[in-house]
Amino acid sequence: MSHPSTLVLIPARMAATRLPGKPLLDIAGLPMIVHVLRRAEAADVGPVAVATDTAEIAAAVEAHGGRVVMTRADHPSGSDRVAEALGVLDPDGRIEIVVNLQGDFPTIRPDNIGAVLGPLADPAVDIATLCAEIHTEEEATNPNVVKVIGSPLSPARLRALYFTRATAPWGEGPRYHHIGLYAYRRAALQRFIALPPSALEQREKLEQLRALEAGMRIDVGIVDTVPRGVDTAADLETARRILSSRN
């Protein structure tokens, strides 16, 4: 169900080094960014727009009926781009929650986008995100898989204590793979982008640690599966296979 106080923003840029022009790469007849747009629209949680500094991305999105906000090219992170776009689209401050959906998640399930809003039902939560349980040792030990260490609040939710590329926590019990989808309260997003990069953020190369080090609360919804991001040529072929089979 759409929420008038919620906005979904998809930051997109052409600067990927491993897959040049990534947002516009063809997957089953559509640019990747359009697949992400369609998933966000299907989630039906609120209006959707793509935030970009690139005319080619804007043209592709608009050609498929999507809304675009042009942003500056010098943003240090997707969160900063999202904050600028939010200010352009909603200068009067009516939007209370903004979802930051990465533009390289063409196979994300719409219900995952809805699920990220769940933790924000608790007014004490500043930022919400998602995770899924890790089931293989390869995933547990892979430094490219970010793990959530959290205190269980319910069978479907954690309060985040830390995020790491290491294999953690120690001992028996579940480990969780972080999914890079965020929902921010508007005030939390503005506070976050005003903070300087933190020591642990720079060490782990994980932006969300800046919020934890500043005392902000991040809660994490637990979902069944991790959506496949597209970072490599192999990821791209996997996404093409998945989405071609759906058509």
UniProtKB/Swiss-Prot annotation:
Listed pathway(s): Nucleotide-sugar biosynthesis; CMP-3-deoxy-D-manno-octulosonate biosynthesis; CMP-3-deoxy-D-manno-octulosonate from 3-deoxy-D-manno-octulosonate and CTP: step 1/1; Bacterial outer membrane biogenesis; lipopolysaccharide biosynthesis
GO CC annotation: cytosol
Keywords: Cytoplasm, Lipopolysaccharide biosynthesis, Nucleotidyltransferase, Transferase
Annotated localization: Cytoplasm
An example Gene Ontology biological process: CMP-keto-3-deoxy-D-manno-octulosonic acid biosynthetic process
Record carries keyword Ubl conjugation: no
EC supergroup of this enzyme: transferase
UniProt EC number: 2.7.7.38
Signal peptide: none
Major site of localization recorded for this protein: cytoplasm
SUPFAM superfamilies found in the cross-reference section: Nucleotide-diphospho-sugar transferases
Recorded catalytic activity of this chain's protein: 3-deoxy-alpha-D-manno-oct-2-ulosonate + CTP = CMP-3-deoxy-beta-D-manno-octulosonate + diphosphate
Pfam families: CTP_transf_3
Molecular functions (GO terms): 3-deoxy-manno-octulosonate cytidylyltransferase activity
InterPro entries registered for this protein in UniProt: Cytidylyl_trans, KdsB, Nucleotide-diphossugar_trans
Membership in a protein family: Belongs to the KdsB family.
Function in brief: Activates KDO (a required 8-carbon sugar) for incorporation into bacterial lipopolysaccharide in Gram-negative bacteria.
Protein name: 3-deoxy-manno-octulosonate cytidylyltransferase
Organism encoding this protein: Rhodopseudomonas palustris (strain BisA53)
